[in-house]
Every structure is written in C-alpha cells, then in structure tokens.
Amino acid sequence: MPCHRDEIPAHDICAALATEFKMPCTCSTGFHVEHASKDDLQTVLDTTAELIDALKKHVARVMRATWDEADEVLAVHEDGSVIGPVDRIKAHAGEGVLHQAFETFLVEGTGDDARLLLCRRSALKRLWGGVLSDSCAGHPEVGEELAAGAARRLQEECGLTSEQAPLNQLGHIVYREDHGDGNCECEWCAVFAAHVDAGALRVNEQEISEVRPVRLGEIDAYLAGHPEPLAPWTRLALEDADIRAKLVELCQE
C-alpha cells in the first residue's frame, strides 16, 4: 500500500479490519512516496477508505458461510412448535437438537421449459460443503418468521428480492442425518419454492459454487444418486409426494 509514512495508511487498514472483525492485527507494511502533494495524500486516504469498506464487505460474505459461536437457532417439538433458542453448534453436534430450518427451490421457465435450479454448496460450508442441493437453505433468526428467513437468505445467497422471488410454501420435512464427523442435521425444515426470471440470480460465490438447471424429468435420477447424490434435506423434500406434486404444479403455472 503506497503511503506517505510507512505506518499510514497500511497500518490503518489492518487496524480497521482487526477492530471490525475482533481479530489481532499481526502486521502491516507500506513504502515511502516522495514529494506527495496534498491532493495525492487525499487520493490515497479516499482509496484507503474504499479499500477498507470493500474488504469489510468481502470478509462479511465469507463469515456468513461459517458459524459464529454466538449464533442461535430455534429448537422445536416434532410438530414444529417452538421451544426456544439453542446454540447453533450444540444443535448440530452429536445427536443434535431438532430445530427450525428452511430450504427453497427456484424454478426458471414453465411447462416443458421449466428448470429446477439446483445449487452446489460452497466448500466453505461446515456441513455438506461442495454438495449439490436446493437453491438456498438456512435457519430463521430468533424472532424471525420462516418465510422472512427464507427471503433474507435468498437475498444474501442469490441476490434476489422478495419481488423477484415470491415464495410459495410447499410443505415441510422432519429429519436427522449424520454428517460423519460428530455433527449432524436435525431439522424441522419448511420447504419453499419460487418462480424467477432467467438470468435473475446474482450468486454469492462464498455460498454457492455452481448453479445447475435441471429438468423435472431428471430429478428421479438425482434421487438415485446419478450423476451425483443430493444433500439429504433436498433429497427428502423431493421424495415427499405432496411436496413434489406442488412443485410440479408450480412449474406448470
């Protein structure tokens, strides 16, 4: 980072980011610029502010794909009634704690041209990273309705507003699936779907590494593991006869 003094603005960038994300600043560096005018210094300061802002946004996007120890999810009974908040890590450890979740299927086109947009989860994901799944999944925040949480995550992961992706609830599934590393998914999972215009997605690459349009006629092969298996909650939703029928109906509209 070019600077008038070695510690400015390189140190300021590191200090700002360390403060924002509560992490230690290990080092910073810069090099001296001879005969810098007032305008030159102002340009450097303005550019530094822009860089800090851009880095904050980028790191925030990456951190959304990880788990904060302070994160909570909503524990529920088998019928979906809420018990109360539970630590997210605890909810996914060992036998798990049944908690609220949602998944959303996005559809492009109608009739014979309809395509289900399956998305590959980023390798950054703690559970089932790199696996093909529904278009977007997540957990509602404490005090947030399921549909509102699904709309929020569509904005964060796919860049879609609620107007671009009006949600229809298709049903729900209740399941538990071991991840094989001492963690699991144990969810009461609402299933949503929405029609979107072709090319509307603006994916967050820290969340999604691939968008794959799939014809409804290809779904059974994916459920059998060909050409590859789906995330367990995606497979279970598509195996549910009522959910599948409502999804097919939506594709015809």
Segments from the language model and where they lie:
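Short, internal acidic amphipathic alpha-helical interface segments
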Residues: M1-K22
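Phosphate/ribose-phosphate-bearing ligand recognition and processing surfaces
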Residues: E20, T26, F31-R64
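Nudix hydrolase/Nudix homology domain
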Residues: T66, G130, I173-E253
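Acidic, metal-coordinating catalytic segment for phosphate/diphosphate chemistry
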Residues: T66-G111
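Conserved Nudix-box catalytic region and its N-terminal flanking loop in Nudix hydrolases
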Residues: I89-A101, D112-E156
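Short, solvent-exposed loop/turn segments that connect beta-strands within catalytic domains
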Residues: G109-R115, G180-G182
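A short coil-to-beta-strand element that immediately follows conserved catalytic motifs
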Residues: T161-G171
